Design a protein with these regions (language model features):
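Long, contiguous binding/interaction regions
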Residues: 1-193
Length: 193
């Protein structure tokens, strides 16, 4: 998994608002995985606007033309306790950092407090390069440290790329199909130190 010094890892896990790591995509592109910030609003909005309709449908299970201001605020305004959100960013030639992926979990404080719902979104030109895989790995470490035992996600049955991310995660997985939705549960109990 991640190769962090024990001291640095404890500090990052104690306060995920400061989470930061450097990674490399499958194609060699350097990326930063870090906690979402309020100033990511425009970059996230631009990434969403560039998505094709099918990508939006696979993520939200409904057509959606754009994000409203309240929806954008909800995306960037996280508490890093019940809701943890990380972004993957790259630096453009001019030095501007742009968001190319978003991964988040929302803990279920009521019904199953040890579980969290998981979701990802990857910018169009960066799909298939391992961004969701990296975000999942980092989110799993944070969630495990926070005492969560499992992630849950509902995935459209034809969304093979997302299902493959879960299958290749190295985490114990169970699946249950209901119509065209596959309910995935990933156990965080093993393989995470």
């Amino acid at each position: 998994m991640l190769d962090l010094s024990p001291t640095l890892e404890r500090a990052l896990m104690a306060d995920p608002r400061n989470y930061y790591a450097r990674e490399t995509l499958k194609d060699g592109t350097p990326v930063t995985i870090r906690a979402i910030r309020k100033d990511d609003k425009e970059s996230i909005h631009n990434a969403f606007r560039a998505l094709d309709r099918e990508a939006v449908y696979r993520r939200f299970f409904a057509p959606k033309q754009d994000l409203t201001d309240p929806e954008l605020e909800q995306v960037i305004d996280v508490d890093f306790s019940q809701v943890v959100a990380l972004v993957a960013t790259v630096s453009r030639a001019d030095g501007e950092e742009i968001v190319i992926g978003d991964g988040r979990y929302v803990a279920d404080k009521e019904g199953k407090p040890e579980r969290a719902e998981l979701g990802f979104l990857t910018a169009e030109p960066y799909r298939g390069r391992g961004i969701a895989t990296l975000l999942l790995r980092h989110l799993a470490r944070i969630a495990h440290h926070a005492g969560l035992s499992a992630f849950e996600a509902d995935v459209l049955a034809y969304n093979a790329p997302m299902l493959a991310v879960f299958e290749r995660s190295g985490l114990p997985i169970s699946r249950r199909r209901e119509g065209n939705i596959i309910h995935v549960t990933l156990s965080l109990g093993s393989g995470l130190n």
